[in-house]
Amino acid sequence: KHTNIVSKKFGSWLFLSEIFLPISLENDNPSIDNCGSCNDCITICPTNALYKDSKIDARKCISYLTIEYKGPIPISLREKIGNKVYGCDDCLSICPWNKFSEPTRQKDFLALEKEKELKFFLNFDENFFKKYFFQSPILRIGWVSFIRNVLIASGNSQIKSLSSSIKKYLTHR
């Protein structure tokens, strides 16, 4: 119901890709409605972007808002974003099919580092952003969207010591 592909063998932590081969392969049988009565993803979604009929309102999806959307994030959704700077994946994290998934062994798909402090990101400038996230998918959202997301997460954190780092962006264009 989270609208992502679910494999009974691998769960829903998947990349959709295509490989061109000079041979024919046997088609898999698509599975339909692997979710049954489970609504865990709908229940956990912070913005209520998921619906029981397996539809999503991307305008409310935190992954869409923090990765794809380039405008100002609606005020009504900012608090629900919490500390998320790039994506969400709450719906994937709770999916029971992921009990079958295994961590990747491909180093290119691993996170760069564990959680960084918001202050670390608030001290970035555009050049450092490009250097730090070189060869990371985060680079593609661009500096403006990245710092927008960091500022929202910083505001949501209510960490008073971030105030001075946030203030420099009040007149930033």
Task: Write out the residue ranges for each language-model feature.
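Catalytic cores of enzyme domains
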Residues: 1-113
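Alpha-helical scaffold domains
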Residues: 69, 73-173
